[in-house]
Amino acid sequence: METIAQLQSKLQEAADLLASVTRELDAHRNAGAAAESFDFARLRCDAENHPYTGHPAARSSMPELYYLLLLTVLTTAEAKEAQWLHLYRITKGADYAQDVHDLLPAAHAMTDAQMVECIECIRRDNLTRAFLIDAMILTLLREEEDTYLLEYIAGLAALMEVPPAEITEVIQLAKCVASQDSERYIEFLGKSSIEHAKETAFYFHQMTDDLNSAVHHNTKHLIIANVSKRNTQINLDEWKANRISFVMCDFENMTFKSNQKHVDFLGCTFKKVYHMCCISINNGTIKDCVFDDCKADAKSPVIRLSNVEISNTEFTHCITEDADANCLFEVDQTTMTGCRFTYCIRKGGASSDAGIVQATNNSILQNCIFECCSTDDRDPLSISMSSIIWTTSRKKAPTSSILLLHNSIVKNVTFQSCTGEKTQQMS
């Protein structure tokens, strides 16, 4: 247990930090107060047409406190119109009925006690990251460096006990949003946690949750987020966008094909795709996805990937019973990292060498796990007859394996409770 002296020391540190934050805020305010000349009615109208739908502030137990503390970022000389528009888009997206501008006098008069109350509410509602992202975006939208403001936000982050690594991520995300750099944003998600998308995808004007209209979006990079769809076959080469990113979508009996576009799937689920190729793309990324209950045949593996980075993705209960099917998962010039295959089964023998995963042309499989996977569940009579036929013809009988490789590399791949041959090279 902590001693009274230790507790007193912590309280003093918190008091000193709060005083420092307040001084930064006061210094910021004392820079001067230019008269506002913005058309707030127009800003509210613009925000209603382009709200940040799904903003996490909607779950705040006391939204006034969230916006009150956020407004302290604007209690400075010459707040920018872009900052106010961002704030209005937050409130509209979070279904806040009041005019946030009415809270501005209270933000100017913020006391230490009120600041502590705001911070405690934000932390209690698990909105710390969302708040800091909004605060940093507002800072960046000033389009000029403001040392006082950055120090103020750093002080708030310290009071909220946010670790330095998380602050770094917040800054990176905020920079992507402020510059509307969607490609950099998707690359960031690919290297970090897809969970970040839940609190940030709605910020991008290139984002849509309407799959039916997505084909007509004439933009360099289109983000489709939080979509649930079933029973549709989509040729992405028919879409106008050059790059297409699906984020946190749920698909059932859906197929996606593209030979020309860069396509990303992040945090998506695919299920019940039978005798059709679920994803066939020639360039892109797949991360944190799940493929469940899919069936392959000779013409259609579950996935057919070329020049793709696929990572941290799970394949469960995917099977084929077609002897002419070369594989369930076909990858070419592709890197597969940290993926897990569970109860993926190849039944029915093989008319040629076959595998669960077929990797060709300098593909890399690394740090993957195969659990309870199996190949070639033929009955003994079928096996005996097949052996006689191939022995008579003096050719090597085709075999099934979990991995079927050609000019490809396997690193640290684990097989747990699997049956059948583990690895073979393509002839």
Regions found by a protein language model. Name each.
Residues A201, H221, N226, N231-Q233, ...:
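Detector for repetitive beta-architecture
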Residues H216:
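Cyclic nucleotide-binding regulatory domains
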Residues A5, S9, D16, R23, ...:
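Intrinsic-disorder/low-complexity peptide segments enriched for small residues
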Residues M1-T75, A79-M207:
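Small-residue-enriched hydrophobic alpha-helices in membranes
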Residues Q206-S213, S228-D237, M248-K257, K271-S280, ...:
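Extracellular beta-strand/beta-solenoid scaffold signature
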